[in-house]
Amino acid sequence: MITYQYTQKDWTTFKEGIKREWAVTNGIGGYAGSSMIGAHSRTHQGYLIASLHAPIERYLVFSKINVTVTVGTSTVSFETSQHRASGKTVYTEGQKFLTSFIYDGSVHYTYETDNFSFEKHITLKRNANVCAVAYELTAGDSDCTFTLTPLFNYREHSESSTPDTLKFETFTEDRTFYLVPEKNKDIAIRFQTSEGTFSERETVYDI
């Protein structure tokens, strides 16, 4: 496997950063993909597009995770997204903290601030509709708090969603959060964590 590595000089602006893209496949028709800076710019991008009946019926079920890190009274957002507001496109530019992107069959991001740095790793399990995302604090205050906001969906990977189509039955058991789409109650999207606690939040939509 060839390793590809890029640094900040390769994404001097948000628009430059979405010109290069990556993809990882799971061997049964499912995949993950996004831009080099982690901002989605196409309907078929996300952390897990699952093939419900391999190798067809591809559905986006897990879009991404937005991250904020709090140290003391300071909170930094690493969200990298584009939104429509007041008739124009606005950007959240977490890529300004991104110092390294590596693709070696899996995906590795390195983020740095004046006070801390961390790595984010994304990969898919072979022959299964499973995505693993890992975070590793590599420098700074070990007492910092990571807040992870996962974004879920349930749509055919070339279609678009509207708020009225994003309806789920949700519940939590042990360290697992379950989402059952109203459009297909025969499946369940499961989100598991190795540590931390689940917190209620307002509904958030992303493009």
What are these regions (language model features)?
Residues 1-207:
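Terminal accessory carbohydrate-recognition/targeting modules of carbohydrate-active enzymes
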